[in-house]
Amino acid sequence: MALPEVRLRFPARWLAFGWAGLCAVISVRSASAQGTFSTILTNGPTAKRLNLVLLAEGYTAAQQATFRADATNVVNNLLNVPPYQSYRRYFNAFAIFVPSNQTGSDHPSQSYYRDTYFNSTYESYGVSDLVTIPPNDRDSDYSHGQGRVDALLQAQMPQYDLAILVVNDLSYGGSGGQIIVTSKSSASSKIVIHESGHTLAKLGDEYSDSFPAFSGPEEPNTTQETRRDFIKWKAWIAPATPLPTPAASAYASAVGLFEGAHYQATNWYRPKLDCMMRTVGVPFCEVCSEALVKSIYQHVRPVESYSPGVTNLAITNRQTLTFGLTPLQPNDHPLTVRWLTNGVTVGGATGASLNLYPLALSNGIHQVRAMVQDDTVLVRNDPSGLLGQTVNWVVQVNLAPAWAKLAPPLRLRDGRFQVSLTGQAPGGFLLQGSTNLATWTTLASNVLSSGTFEFIDPATNYRGRSYRAVLPP
């Protein structure tokens, strides 16, 4: 059965404007309540994740566990749909519980009023399933609704990116605006998905029905442009697709230019015949999915961490230096990694680390670069490079010249040879021995960065033996 769509055909940004009205029950408790804070989903530090916060409305003190279960369902319903499901690891989710005196929400036409903390109500602005909190057409006082939300968010999770108010009412309904409001009805989960498109990616409604006095600029998924080369989603349009595109089943799966969007039946266009931003329950189209993925990367970067954490380095010895990073991998595909030294790609280096050998570099300044990219098929147009991140290190190599002097070997009374090595090599020497000057065996490694090194060869069965000091490879 098709889900109701009437609620969603109300421009979200209009909800910021309310006017004075009467509501039978208004909660006038202090807006300074701290609430109970808990974690639903954690994938990383809040500074490096997109943070969802869910708040309880119409749940009594005895229903805290019920709210947590309902809030978890809201999170799962959102993050289990494309494109969010690919980037679930990029999200955290938290809950703030403040008890209400009564369960549910107001239904004014039924003379049903509840004493709840955020004073939510159905039937806002004459729309039966439009659920809002003040300021609205029934109560213009910001402090009775949105002000309480803002105070809790500021106190408990100022790093939030998306706030969702979960209303303990089984009737279908919700709204968008500064926050998303949704009832606990399973059908209402689609409202959260739709409204997240507005909040995160600034997507527009694709409805054709007129809404009085609605205006505004183009959104990522709406346009008045009809010239193929200037359409913002032209990368998704096949050359054979006619523009404007007929609203016919033959083009149901095509990205094109379909007339009717932005609350206008004519002269405004959308990318696809149908989409979540037009019909509840339909998946996001390619253009909207692309905008959502890019919006995720506006909040979360693809490199979780890197080392060395200092990006200006000085090397004065020949020890191997390891560079590494931790890519934030999506759930269903890997990020690609490239390493470059002095602008040249290192062949075969596609993993999370790179070993740098100072001996392979001349003294002076060198650059090491790691480039991480999400090559998802969901994005074709990324002019700002949101899906990639580059980490640069500047390496100053300053190795002192190596020199060595071997004293003639001294045969000891027990038949062994003693070797004295004097010299300097920041990475040390390999001391090698041979009986034929063709085959050399390493006797000691990483010896003598500077000064004198004394070595006694344990072998006693050689009548003669040659020794040499070489730099390690």
Functional labels for PLM-detected ranges:
Residues 28-33:
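Boundary at the C-terminal end of the N-terminal hydrophobic targeting segment
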Residues 34-152, 183:
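Propeptide-to-catalytic entry region of secreted or membrane-anchored zinc metalloproteases
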Residues 189-206:
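Active-site recognition of the HExxH zinc-binding catalytic motif
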Residues 352-365, 454-458:
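Solvent-exposed segments in extracellular or luminal domains encompassing
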